[in-house]
Amino acid sequence: MLVWFAEYLLKYNTAFNVVSYISFRSIMALLTAMAIGLWIGPKVINRLQILKFGQEVRNDGPESHFKKRGTPTMGGIMILVSIGVSSLLWADLRNPYVWFTLFVLFGYGIVGFVDDYWKIARKNTDGLVARWKYFWLSFIAFIAAFSMYAMGKDTAATQLVVPFFKEVMPQLGLFYIILAYFVIVGTSNAVNLTDGLDGLAIVPTIMVTAAFALIAWATGNIHAAEYLYIPYIRHSGELAIMCTAIVGAGLGFLWYNTYPAQVFMGDVGSLSLGGALGVIAVLVRQELLLLVMGGVFVVEALSVILQVGSYKLRQKRIFRMAPIHHHFELKGWPEPRVIVRFWIITLVLVLVGLVTLKLR
């Protein structure tokens, strides 16, 4: 929005040209989202406490989690508000990639909100009926995937980028829609599964999204794209603003979510953040790189799949409890140790992922 005002005021003072730079707006989007999160955090937490929107805890989980029962949840609302206001202020709203991201972010946020509300209303951890939850997640993902494909059909925007190979960029055709669907829905659910400990999901999300801010800038800059042998995609540079808005909102939320947490993001936060991260990875054509940098999310999701599959086939469990962070807790690891070690692993994976951009 501010881009429009700056363009109008440019004829009066050339200093307003600074707003045209993605780097400037990215920094401002981060600071704005973080400031909003820090400001509204206490208000949101207080309101959630008044409404008795407290966390429900599984009875078969680690005993250390019982003290978390009643901690305000649905704090993802403050994340969505922070991202929404910041991106509307600093992103160029004429850019369709901005709207694709916002559509998935808030669409998944609504699904997560309903899921959280049902958990609170029923006083259990089941939430929204699974088939309806995945129906709406799939419906939103398919709309986004089809729209993105229609806009970028048979261009660099629908090529598959393979790490380490600069010449291997096949056109995906209609398979683009299927791949985009699985990346968006899969990432959303993986982040949701990771969100089981204080700060465990938000910090890896911040790290991976910060890396994608750099990737988005490079993909939208023809010279940087040529240097890194990645496809140049015209509209993708603006996604850097969306990424830094997510980073800023995440930092603002982390202020209140760090151990011991004053608030949990709930599904309204984890589903929306995961969905946004997935759609950004699709738009900059780095789905495979997301698997590397978001390795913690991948392992968390795989641990659940393997646990369920093993129990159905063999009536035996592989882990003491899934997702895998609970397995380490039941082995005797203190919660902060699990959290920080997963953060460290994510940092290493993000750095490895960024290095692969040059190793082609």
Curated annotation (Swiss-Prot):
Keywords in alphabetical order: Cell cycle, Cell division, Cell inner membrane, Cell membrane, Cell shape, Cell wall biogenesis/degradation, Magnesium, Membrane, Metal-binding, Peptidoglycan synthesis, Transferase, Transmembrane, Transmembrane helix
Top-level lineage group: Bacteria
UniProt catalytic activity: UDP-N-acetyl-alpha-D-muramoyl-L-alanyl-gamma-D-glutamyl-meso-2,6-diaminopimeloyl-D-alanyl-D-alanine + di-trans,octa-cis-undecaprenyl phosphate = di-trans,octa-cis-undecaprenyl diphospho-N-acetyl-alpha-D-muramoyl-L-alanyl-D-glutamyl-meso-2,6-diaminopimeloyl-D-alanyl-D-alanine + UMP
Annotated TM spans: 26-46, 73-93, 98-118, 132-152, 168-188, 199-219, 236-256, 263-283, 288-308, 338-358
EC number: 2.7.8.13
HAMAP family named among the record's database cross-references: MraY
Entry protein name: Phospho-N-acetylmuramoyl-pentapeptide-transferase
Organism of origin: Haemophilus ducreyi (strain 35000HP / ATCC 700724)
Gene transcribed to yield this protein: mraY
